[in-house]
UniProtKB/Swiss-Prot annotation:
GO terms for biological process: lipoprotein localization to outer membrane; protein localization to outer membrane. The keyword Phosphoprotein does not apply. Residues 6-227 form the ABC transporter domain. Belongs to the ABC transporter superfamily. Lipoprotein translocase (TC 3.A.1.125) family. One of its GO terms (molecular function) is ATP hydrolysis activity. It is found in: Cell inner membrane. This is Lipoprotein-releasing system ATP-binding protein LolD. The gene is lolD.
Amino acid sequence: MNDIILTSQKLYKSYHDGTSRVEVLKGVDLAITKGDRIAIIGPSGSGKSTLLHLLGGLDKPTSGLITLGKVDWQKINEKQRCQLRNQQLGFVYQFHHLLPEFTALENVMMPLLLAGMAVKDAEEKAINMLEQVGLKPRLAHKPAQLSGGERQRVAIARALVHQPHCVLADEPTGNLDEATASKVFDLMLELNKKMNTALVIVTHDQRIAERMDRVLVLHEGSLYARE
């Protein structure tokens, strides 16, 4: 039980669409432990990204409990949520969301600087992380000077540079060609194993899902293990 990082209990999320109420999540229970590899699959519009946002404290549930470590997301303010996210979670999206005016190195340094780390220490850690993703020769390049695969590797380095307990990834290879997507995903699995960081991926790609330890299906608001 001590290895549990992130949990949801009886998680509900609904939206109002005009006069009607749309229930996206209906009592979702999930426990994520250290080093987990979890794929979440399901039809488009089933609420996979919504679930990921809730787990990451980027949105609030209609009801239910979400805990990161021993902290209830609902019992802390926005500033505390930001601090907790920066300390314990990493995020990778389909689009890299790198800051275009900054170099690869500066983008990867950003979470460390926001956490109050000294510039020299942040630079050293960021260089090391970029080396691990094979981009040491590209430190000074801005996103526009990098290929799609390279940009996504910078995004992965940024997500992992502070050694989070869990990485939440939403279609991280969705914008890449098949060969590049395979290489990027291989890298994510390698770093997941090396750093013992839990990895939760929302994906439509069955080949990615097949390589994860657990495959969960989100359908009509319910989350269950694929048989």
